[in-house]
Amino acid sequence: MNLHEYQAKALFAEYGLPVSEGYACDTPQEAVEAAGRIGGNMWVVKCQVHAGGRGKAGGVKVTGDKEEIRAFAEKWLGKNLVTYQTDENGQPVAKILVESCTDIANELYLGAVVDRATRRVVFMASTEGGVEIEKVAEETPELIHKAIIDPIAGPQPFQARDLGFKLGLNPTQMKQFTKIFMGLAQMFLDHDFALLEINPLVITTEGNLHCLDGKIGVDGNALFRQPKIKDMHDPSQDDAREAHAAKFELNYVALDGNVGCMVNGAGLAMGTMDIVNLHGGKPANFLDVGGGATKERVSEAFKIILSDSNVKAVLVNIFGGIVRCDMIAEGIIGAVKEVGVKVPVVVRLEGTNAELGAKVLAESGLDIIAAKSLTDAAQQVVKAAEGK
């Protein structure tokens, strides 16, 4: 689960980190009034969406005119912002963040992730702030400095000082950086974050460190013990199909291919996508129906898959372990009849009562292609998607 910038900065402020005075606004009038409360003669207005690249897409504006703030809010509120990180439809803008303007002397990067290789929280800092860190990692990886947080000892001030020296900070900035580092590390651990970024972490013209942006990703599996964070969820930013799938405990991720995939088990689902790709097809989705492939869940899975107009064929790959294949076959037949599937459906069943399941499918009278193996299933569905 991701948080908006204004939500991230509210958390930063709770931990005593330096952030700009700002207000998240729902209407153009609120945005103008927010500028008045902030004071000064220059403000920054930002569209609040779960995507980067807002500035290049016109979603960020620096202005000294309150009427321009009103016009910006009128332009974007209720509209979709398309950036390089969104799909072609973009993300809906429901709030505008109005902030005081900060004079910048230099831009740095500070972030943290859960690193699966080291099984630790790893902090990263760089002098290359204000640009995509992925680009820095690819082109100049030596400019990214790391600190690994020991899960027993926790974050240590010496780690902050080590990063600060590598960033070329002066003694005053070093103290500020240490406070920011320790606060962020504690916040990361307290709230079960999976990702945290301040890009850029700026040095102002007065020589002080300031958190100019904030990006936070939370471990969705930990939300049961993070009620405060869970309440920050903005469903408008979710993919509509993924949100619908979650209601039925289906794990769905939309992709850009034309072969719909319905599988039970995440590992088998990834293997299915790989073999479809191996035989020249492009998966349209990842969809794990879980252990209980009931008629209702299979029906909803078909509806979700077929809501993607790019899908030209569907591959159902089920391993019957706890659930018998004949029961799964009956569920598939019922779902196909209920949904009215118009594209070719290839089914591969393996495991308990697999032969009986294949017989049930064959006697259904429906246009369902029963595959003999996973390779056969992949080849059949790729041909079907191509209209062969």
Curated annotation (Swiss-Prot):
A Pfam family it matches: Ligase_CoA
Catalyzed reactions per annotation: succinate + ATP + CoA = succinyl-CoA + ADP + phosphate; GTP + succinate + CoA = succinyl-CoA + GDP + phosphate
Pathway(s): Carbohydrate metabolism; tricarboxylic acid cycle; succinate from succinyl-CoA (ligase route): step 1/1
Keyword Repressor: no
InterPro entries, per database record: ATP-grasp, ATP-grasp_succ-CoA_synth-type, ATP_grasp_subdomain_1, Succ-CoA_synthase_bsu_CS, SUCC_ACL_C, Succ_CoA_ligase-like_bsu, Succinyl-CoA_synth-like
Residues engaged in binding Mg(2+): N199, D213
PROSITE patterns according to UniProt: ATP_GRASP, SUCCINYL_COA_LIG_3
Residues the record lists as binding substrate: N264, G321, I322, V323
Keywords: ATP-binding, Ligase, Magnesium, Metal-binding, Nucleotide-binding, Tricarboxylic acid cycle
GO biological process, one term: succinyl-CoA metabolic process
UniProt keyword annotation of Transport present: no
EC number(s) recorded for this UniProt protein: 6.2.1.5
EC class: ligase
One GO molecular-function entry: succinate-CoA ligase (GDP-forming) activity
Residue stretches spanning the membrane: none
Location of the ATP-grasp domain: 9-244
Superkingdom to which the source organism belongs: Bacteria
Listed GO CC annotations: cytosol; succinate-CoA ligase complex
Purpose of the protein: Succinyl-CoA synthetase functions in the citric acid cycle (TCA), coupling the hydrolysis of succinyl-CoA to the synthesis of either ATP or GTP and thus represents the only step of substrate-level phosphorylation in the TCA. The beta subunit provides nucleotide specificity of the enzyme and binds the substrate succinate, while the binding sites for coenzyme A and phosphate are found in the alpha subunit.
Name under which the protein is recorded: Succinate--CoA ligase [ADP-forming] subunit beta
Species assigned in the record: Shewanella amazonensis (strain ATCC BAA-1098 / SB2B)
Lineage of the organism: Bacteria, Pseudomonadati, Pseudomonadota, Gammaproteobacteria, Alteromonadales
